[in-house]
Amino acid sequence: MTSACGDNVLFNTQNEILLRCRRAMTKQSFSTLFEQKREFVVSIGILVLLATMYAILGASTWAVEPIESATNFCEGISDGLIKEPMNTLSNLTYVFVGLVVLWNLPTTREKSRNPMLERSVYPILFATGSIYIGVGSFAMHGTNTNWGTSMDWTGMLFFISFPVYYNLSRQYRWSDRFFLTVFFCVFVLTALLDTFAANNNVTLIENFSGTRNLKLSSITRDYLWSLYIGVWLIQEAKNLSGNQLSWMIGVPLVACITLSVGAPTMQIILLCLMFIGIALALHFNPGQTLLRKAQPDLWIGFGCYIVGNIVWRYGRSGEAACNPDSLFQYHAVWHILTGASLYFFYRYFRTETKPESSEL
């Protein structure tokens, strides 16, 4: 009898020890995962928080109130928390790409000749920009509100400015602190200007291009957006052509003329002049040549964007291809294609090897 009781006590003690060991191992495993994937875990937490806030705030506002700002991207407006289901949910592509970038961060902070291969601010900002686009566009199409539209535009400006300033930081050997200062100062000023312009219908110049006025909102949503894309093209043309001026001027001019949709003539002219000036400045002050492998990732990324740009045109309200009641929405395809392009651009940036000094 005594032996049986003793065995039972011993058995219970062993079970308790095993249970404690399992708890300790689980805690240690989570601790290790959090340490190695801190940025990924934090991002998941923030996304869950944003989703919760979206549901709580939306239940008493845009879900029950008339729409405030129609996006005019074909899809019919639905009742409830998500006004444009397909145009909204397709933005999860950007979020997924950002999370993939964060998951792929190294588990240690070892230095590399390529910052995009490090656990550093540069891939984290790239991922943040991708997630920001997804969240911002989700807010615009999901809520049909003015603040949602502002989130959409600021997200796009945040991301598209990153390659430009990142390339400059690599070409001219900026410190991390200088890069962050320039990047965030310009972005904050841009976001404030865009938000103010979106809520105040300010006309800067009447009849600027024919009968079309130049509005304050055009500075960020037309000129600055296009300028960032053009400068990025100039930078990549510079690196891939070995600083040949004809490519540095020709590529952004062709893109500006062929990919612009409904832009005023004066806007096209001014952008082309700015592209020529910037190409000349970078040509005669080249800094380091960035050695990256364009094939296949850069070309696939640009291909996805160009096809997406064409598809985007069919996704506007009033187009012959527009079917508001269909589950297939061209604008949703635009989101998926451009989300894919971000992933391939990320892969392209990871191919950089040691920069070389350029000599004229």
Feature annotation, model-predicted:
Residues 271-279:
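Active/binding-pocket-proximal capping segment
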Residues 286:
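Short Cys/His-rich Zn2+-coordinating modules
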Residues 278-282, 290, 297:
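A two-mode feature
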Residues 21, 26-263, 267-269, 291-299, ...:
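Early transmembrane hairpin module of multi-pass membrane proteins
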Residues 14-16:
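Charged/polar low-complexity intrinsically disordered segments
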